[in-house]
Structures are given as structure tokens and as C-alpha cells.
């Protein structure tokens, strides 16, 4: 099995950089999932804070005598800073499915695609267009943005986690 942990951030401000820096230290990979998208930003909001925290922890490791940011962890080597992956989900009110979480983890694995920025539970282009008009629209999009199909990540499976006999109703 794969050893996976979850940090559920319930409050964004003040940002718990002290705790995040310690939790992330030495991890093999960290995926940050955010229910937002900011296409022209360098990073999504939470990833920006986490990247800033990791950077400050690395700065602490530069000076062996004193930490520049005493409340934060000290990363003495670059290897103590985990690779960071940023995922966006829930766009267009789409539900995050188990398949998306599986895909986010599989992306970080050595045999995974290792995309640094990706989207879950959304297809920008359908594999097979429903109508000729949709096919023309999709071709126009793909011509203008050839990499758009690669932005979405899918997991290898989508297990049904509902209890036996239950149904899902969406309003």
C-alpha cells in the first residue's frame, strides 16, 4: 500500500506556517487541493502560502547559528522540502469523486505523470463529441490550446464509497 496523510486546514488566517512547516518536512510529495482556480496567478492561494512557508524553512537552514524565522521549522537540506503539486477541483460545482483523489496521489508516484498543476473531476474536452457542433467547438479549443486535454488528471479507478442500498440525490 501507499502511505498517505491528510492535513485539513480549517482556518486560512492566521496561516499556521509553524505547523505546516513541521508537517511537510521530509515528505516525499505533497499535493495541495483547492476548490478554486486563478488562471493568471503564479499559484493558487493556499499553495502560495505553503510555498512561502517551505521557502522560509529553507532560509532557516542557511544559518547554522540562528533561525531567521524562529517559529518555523528548519530545513537544513533542499531534500527536506517536499515536491509540491497543485490541484484544483470543484469547478462548475462538480463533485470531487474518489477517482480524482486517486489520480492526485498517482500523479505524485515515480511512475506517475508528475504534473505540478492539474484539475480534478473535469474534462475540458470530451473523448467523443456528442454533436457535430460540439466537435467543431472542441477542435477550435484544442487548436488554440493544444495542452488543454492534459490539464485534467484521472485516477486509475473510481470506487463506489456509498453504503450498500444508498442512493445519491443532487439538487
Predicted segments, located by residue:
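General small-molecule cofactor/ligand-binding pocket signal
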Residues: 5-7, 85
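Short acidic loop-to-helix transition motifs that present clustered carboxylates
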Residues: 9-17
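A short acidic (Asp/Glu
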Residues: 16-19, 41-43
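Catalytic phosphate/nucleotide-handling subdomain of diverse soluble enzymes
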Residues: 19-21, 25-28
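Peripheral docking tails and interdomain loops at the edges
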Residues: 33-158
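A short, charged/proline- and glycine-enriched loop
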Residues: 162-169
Amino acid at each position: 500500500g501507499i502511505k498517505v496523510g491528510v492535513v485539513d486546514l480549517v482556518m486560512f488566517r492566521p496561516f499556521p506556517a509553524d505547523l505546516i512547516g513541521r508537517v511537510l518536512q521530509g515528505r516525499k510529495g505533497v499535493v495541495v487541493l483547492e476548490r478554486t482556480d486563478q488562471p493568471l496567478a503564479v499559484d493558487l492561494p493556499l499553495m502560495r502560502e505553503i510555498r512561502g512557508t517551505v521557502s522560509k524553512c529553507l532560509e532557516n537552514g542557511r544559518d547554522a547559528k540562528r533561525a531567521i524565522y524562529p517559529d518555523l521549522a528548519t530545513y537544513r537540506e533542499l531534500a527536506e522540502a517536499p515536491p509540491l503539486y497543485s490541484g484544483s477541483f470543484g469547478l462548475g460545482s462538480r463533485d470531487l469523486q474518489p477517482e480524482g483523489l486517486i489520480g492526485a496521489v498517482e500523479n505524485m508516484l515515480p511512475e506517475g505523470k508528475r504534473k505540478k498543476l492539474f484539475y480534478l473531476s473535469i474534462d475540458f474536452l470530451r473523448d467523443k463529441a456528442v454533436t457535430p457542433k460540439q466537435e467543431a467547438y472542441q477542435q477550435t479549443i484544442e487548436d488554440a490550446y493544444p495542452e488543454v486535454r492534459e490539464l485534467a488528471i484521472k485516477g486509475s479507478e473510481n470506487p463506489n464509497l456509498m453504503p450498500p442500498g444508498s442512493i445519491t440525490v443532487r439538487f
